[in-house]
C-alpha cells in the first residue's frame, strides 16, 4: 500500500510542478533533488533486492559504505551498469519534464505543493522506511527486552544418549518443497521430510540471512550482529566468546564434534566460530583434498555435494563403530546463488520451469537427491536408532535464477527432524525462526529448551510468536548483541606478531591485515574479506579527522607515505588522519610493540583529497621505481605503460590468466633496447611445463621452457624495429580453481611469473 501511495505522490508532484509551478531556479533545484532522491531510493531497493532477495537489509548497509568485491561479483557487473545507466536516463528525463513549461510565470503555491508531495513520496516509500529502521538500529543503545528474553542454557546435557547429524542445505529453503508450485522438484528429500517433525513456518530475521549468520543463529540463538560485516569474521580470533552455544554444550557433555563442508573453512570465519564453540574436528576444501577420490572434481566454491556427503557418511560410519558419542554437522554448497552447480552422480541433472531449463532449480533437485541418499544410508544402518537427523536451510535463497518464482510463494526456511529413537511424523505450523533450531535440538537431546533468544518449538514460545514486529524487535536488540563480542573500547599499546600474522591489543586478537577506526570510546575493526573492499579502499571512506591504525603489507601504503618500501611484502603499521599527519613503521621484529599516537593537527583538505585519490588507484595503475617487474606486489615499474593477461598478486608472484587475455602483454612507455637480455624468473602450470612457450618482441620470437618449480632463464633479443611490447603466449592454459578466491569462476593459468627484467646489452 505504501509503495502505491509513494508512486502516486511522486507522479502528482511531477505533474503539478511541470504544468503549474512555472520558472524558478531554486524551486526547480529543490524539487528535482527530492524527486531524484525518490528515484535513487527505489533503484537502491531494486538493486538490493537483486543481490539479497530481502530488500535493503543489514548487509546492504555495509555494502553502501564499502565496495562490493569477492565471490561471484562478475555475474553482477552487467546489472550494475544497467542500473547506473537507468539512473542517468531517469534523472535526465525528470529534469526535462519538470522544465517543460519553464517560460510560464512562477507560482509559489504550486511550487510548494509539488515539493511537499515530493517529500511525501520519499517518506512513504518502502526504501526510505527500511533505511530509516536500519539507521535507527545503528544508533540505539539497545532494547530492555533483551535481558528478559536472552537466556543462557546449562553447559551440559545430564544424560546424553543420542548422536546428532545436522545437515545445512545451502539456500535450500522450504519453499522448494511445495509440490504444487514446483512439481517433482524435491521428491527424495521431500518424502523424508514428510516422515519426520516438519516445522513449516521458520521465518528469516535480520542478521540470520547468510551462511555464517544462519549457523550462528541456529547454534547460539542470536543473530550475527558485529561491529564489522559478518562475512569478514575470518579476521577475528574468537567468535562471541561469552556465549554458550550448542557445540559448547555437546562438547561439555562428552560429544566429539565434527564439521564437514566442501568450501574453504576460512571463508567468513566458519573455522573461528566452530573452534570457539566446541568443534575440534573440521574438514573443508583444504583438509578434504588429500582424502577424496578425485581432488580435481570441484566447483567454484569447493568440492561438490556428492563428494562432501560421501565423506560425511564415512565419518558417520567410523564414529558410530567407535561407540563414541558424537555430533556430525555438514554444509552443502551446490545450491549457492546465482546459478548453482550440478554434481555428476545425480540421476536428474535438469529441471525445466516455464518450458525451459532452470539452472537453480536443477541444482536444487540434484543436491536434495544427494542429501536424501546420505540420510537413507544412515536410516538403513544399525546406528540410526541412536541418532537424531536434522535438516535445515542455512538461510533463504538469495537472488538466483529461481528467485522470482520463489517470491510468488510464502517463503520459509527448511527445518525438519528425523528421530531414530522415537519416529514421529507431524507437520507443525507454529511461528518460529532459525534462532529456535538449536534450542529445539538441544531439548530433544536431553538438555534445556532454550539457547540465547531461541526457544524449543515443541515446548517453548518463539520470539516470532511473542512479537508481531519481531524483525524490528531484533534490530532494536542489535547493540545488546554486539556487546556480547566484548570488543575493546580503546587502543593504546599493541603487539604485531609477524609469524602468526596477528595483532593484539586490550585483550583482543585479530588476524592481519586489519584497519581500525579509533574514536574516544570506540575501536571499530575493519577486516578484509572476500566480500569487502581492500583496506585502502575502506580507508578512503574515512573522514578527514578520523583516527586510523592500518596494518598491512608495506607496499600497499608505500605509494602514499613510504616510497622506499614500495617493493616490501613485510608488515607495516600506518596511523594518523587522512587530512592530517600519517606515519608508516616497518614491522622488523617477530614480536613488534607499537603505541598509538594521534596528533591534533590542522586538517589540510588538499592533503585529504590527495590521499583519498591515491588510495583509490586500482592495482594495475600503481607504478613503482624498480629496474624489474616484481610480480608479488601490486602495479608495475614506472617504465611500463600497461599490461594485460596477468592475474592478481599472490605471495610468490602472479599467474598468467587467459580469462583476462590469451597472451601476457607488457607494453613499455619507450621502445625496448636494440639489443637486450630478458631475464625471466617463473614456473609453468599443468601441461605448460616442459613445453616451448613463445616469447615475442616485435618480429623476433624466442622460446621459453619452464618446469613446475621456479627457475630463472635468460633470453637474448635483438629489436631493430624499436618495438615496445613484450608478449608471452603460454601454449596450454588450464582452467582451474588453484589458488582462486572462493566463489570466483576458474582462472585459465599458464605460467607463474616472479620477476621479469630487461637488461640493456646494446654496444
Swiss-Prot record:
Highest taxon of the lineage: Bacteria
Keywords: Cell inner membrane, Cell membrane, Membrane, Transferase, Transmembrane, Transmembrane helix
Documented EC number(s): 2.7.8.20
Topology within the bilayer: Multi-pass membrane protein
Regions that span the bilayer: 1-21, 26-46, 77-97, 108-128
Gene3D superfamilies to which the protein is assigned, alphabetical: Alkaline Phosphatase, subunit A (3.40.720.10)
Chemical reaction(s) catalysed: a phosphatidylglycerol + a membrane-derived-oligosaccharide D-glucose = a 1,2-diacyl-sn-glycerol + a membrane-derived-oligosaccharide 6-(glycerophospho)-D-glucose
Claim: NAD is one of the keywords in the record: no
UniProt GO MF annotations: phosphatidylglycerol-membrane-oligosaccharide glycerophosphotransferase activity
GO biological process: glucan biosynthetic process
Stored InterPro entries: Alkaline_phosphatase_core_sf (IPR017850), DUF7024 (IPR054288), OpgB (IPR020881), OpgB/LTA_synthase_biosynth (IPR050448), Sulfatase_N (IPR000917)
A GO-annotated cellular component: plasma membrane
Main EC class the enzyme belongs to: transferase
UniProt key word Glycosyltransferase: no
Cellular location(s): Cell inner membrane
Pathway: Glycan metabolism; osmoregulated periplasmic glucan (OPG) biosynthesis
Entries under HAMAP family matching the protein: MdoB_OpgB
Function: Transfers a phosphoglycerol residue from phosphatidylglycerol to the membrane-bound nascent glucan backbones.
Family under the similarity heading: Belongs to the OpgB family.
Record protein name field: Phosphoglycerol transferase I
Native organism: Salmonella choleraesuis (strain SC-B67)
Amino acid at each position: 500500500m505504501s509503495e502505491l501511495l509513494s508512486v502516486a505522490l511522486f507522479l502528482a508532484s511531477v505533474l503539478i510542478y511541470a504544468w503549474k509551478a512555472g520558472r524558478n531556479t531554486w524551486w526547480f533545484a529543490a524539487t528535482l533533488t527530492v524527486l531524484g532522491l525518490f528515484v535513487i531510493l527505489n533503484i537502491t531497493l531494486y538493486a538490493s533486492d537483486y543481490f539479497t532477495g530481502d530488500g535493503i537489509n543489514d548487509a546492504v548497509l555495509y555494502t553502501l559504505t564499502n565496495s562490493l568485491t569477492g565471490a561471484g561479483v562478475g555475474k553482477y557487473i552487467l546489472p550494475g551498469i544497467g542500473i547506473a545507466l537507468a539512473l542517468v536516463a531517469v534523472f535526465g528525463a525528470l529534469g526535462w519534464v519538470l522544465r517543460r513549461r519553464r517560460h510560464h510565470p512562477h507560482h509559489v503555491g504550486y511550487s510548494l505543493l509539488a515539493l511537499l508531495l515530493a517529500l511525501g513520496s520519499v517518506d512513504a516509500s518502502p526504501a526510505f522506511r527500511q533505511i530509516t529502521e536500519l539507521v535507527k538500529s545503528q544508533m540505539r543503545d539497545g532494547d530492555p527486552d533483551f535481558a528478559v528474553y536472552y537466556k543462557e542454557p546449562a553447559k551440559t546435557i545430564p544424560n546424553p544418549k543420542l548422536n546428532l547429524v545436522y545437515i545445512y542445505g545451502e539456500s535450500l529453503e522450504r519453499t522448494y518443497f511445495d509440490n504444487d508450485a514446483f512439481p517433482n522438484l524435491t521428491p527424495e528429500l521431500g518424502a523424508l521430510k514428510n516422515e519426520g517433525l516438519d516445522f513449516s513456518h521458520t521465518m528469516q530475521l535480520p542478521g540470520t540471512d547468510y551462511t555464517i549468520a544462519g549457523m550462528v543463529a541456529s547454534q547460539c540463538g542470536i543473530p550475527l550482529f558485529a561491529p564489522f560485516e559478518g562475512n569478514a569474521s575470518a579476521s577475528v580470533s574468537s567468535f562471541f566468546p561469552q556465549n554458550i552455544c550448542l557445540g559448547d554444550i555437546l562438547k561439555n557433555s562428552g560429544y566429539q564434534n565434527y564439521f564437514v563442508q566442501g568450501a574453504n573453512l576460512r571463508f567468513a570465519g566458519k573455522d573461528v566460530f566452530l573452534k570457539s564453540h566446541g568443534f575440534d574436528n573440521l574438514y573443508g576444501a583444504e583438509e578434504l583434498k588429500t582424502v577424496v577420490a578425485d581432488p580435481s572434481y570441484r566447483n567454484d566454491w569447493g568440492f561438490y555435494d556428492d563428494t562432501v556427503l560421501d565423506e560425511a557418511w564415512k565419518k558417520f560410519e567410523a564414529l558410530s563403530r567407535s561407540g563414541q558419542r558424537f555430533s556430525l554437522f555438514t554444509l552443502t554448497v551446490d545450491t549457492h546463488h546465482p546459478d548453482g552447480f550440478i554434481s555428476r552422480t545425480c540421476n536428474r541433472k535438469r529441471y525445466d520451469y516455464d518450458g525451459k531449463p532452470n539452472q537453480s532449480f536443477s541444482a536444487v533437485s540434484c543436491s536434495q537427491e544427494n542429501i536424501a541418499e546420505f540420510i537413507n544410508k544412515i536410516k538403513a544402518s544399525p546406528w540410526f536408532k541412536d541418532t537424531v537427523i536434522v535438516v535445515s536451510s542455512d538461510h533463504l535463497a538469495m537472488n538466483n535464477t529461481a528467485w522470482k518464482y520463489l517470491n510468488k510463494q510464502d517463503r520459509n526456511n527448511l527445518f525438519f527432524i528425523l528421530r531414530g529413537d522415537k519416529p514421529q511424523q507431524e507437520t507443525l505450523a507454529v511461528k518460529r525462526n532459525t534462532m529456535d533450531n538449536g534450542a529445539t535440538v538441544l531439548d530433544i537431546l536431553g538438555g534445556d529448551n532454550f539457547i540465547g533468544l531461541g526457544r524449543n518449538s515443541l515446548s517453548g514460545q518463539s520470539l516470532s510468536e511473542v512479537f508481531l514486529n519481531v524483525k524490528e524487535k531484533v534490530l532494536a536488540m542489535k547493540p545488546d548483541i554486539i556487546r556480547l563480542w566484548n570488543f575493546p573500547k580503546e587502543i593504546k599499546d599493541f603487539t604485531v606478531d609477524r609469524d602468526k600474522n596477528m595483532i593484539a591489543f586490550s585483550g583482543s586478537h585479530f588476524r592481519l591485515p586489519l584497519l581500525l577506526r579509533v574514536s574516544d570510546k570506540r575501536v571499530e575493526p575493519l577486516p578484509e574479506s572476500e566480500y569487502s573492499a581492500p583496506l585502502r579502499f575502506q580507508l578512503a571512506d574515512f573522514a578527514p579527522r578520523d583516527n586510523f591504525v592500518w596494518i598491512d603489507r608495506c607496499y600497499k601504503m608505500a605509494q602514499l607515505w613510504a616510497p622506499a618500501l614500495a617493493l616490501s611484502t613485510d608488515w607495516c603499521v600506518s596511523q594518523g588522519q587522512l587530512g592530517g599527519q600519517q606515519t608508516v613503521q616497518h614491522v622488523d621484529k617477530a614480536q613488534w610493540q607499537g603505541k598509538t599516537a594521534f596528533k591534533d593537527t590542522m586538517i589540510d583538505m588538499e592533503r585529504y583529497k590527495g590521499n583519498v585519490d591515491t588510495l583509490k588507484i586500482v592495482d594495475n595503475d600503481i607504478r613503482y621505481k624498480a629496474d624489474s617487474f616484481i610480480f608479488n606486489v601490486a602495479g608495475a615499474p614506472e617504465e611500463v605503460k600497461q599490461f594485460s593477461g596477468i592475474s592478481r598478486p599472490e605471495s610468490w608472484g602472479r599467474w598468467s590468466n587467459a580469462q583476462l587475455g590469451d597472451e601476457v602483454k607488457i607494453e613499455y612507455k619507450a621502445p625496448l633496447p636494440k639489443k637486450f637480455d630478458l631475464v625471466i624468473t617463473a614456473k609453468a602450470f599443468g601441461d605448460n611445463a616442459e613445453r616451448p612457450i613463445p616469447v615475442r618482441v616485435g618480429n623476433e620470437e624466442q622460446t621459453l621452457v619452464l618446469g613446475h618449480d621456479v627457475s630463472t632463464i635468460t633470453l637474448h633479443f635483438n629489436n631493430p624495429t624499436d618495438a615496445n611490447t613484450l608478449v608471452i603466449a603460454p601454449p596450454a592454459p588450464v582452467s582451474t580453481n588453484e589458488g582462486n578466491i572462493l566463489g570466483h569462476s576458474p582462472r585459465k593459468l599458464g605460467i607463474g611469473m616472479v620477476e621479469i627484467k630487461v637488461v640493456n646489452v646494446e654496444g
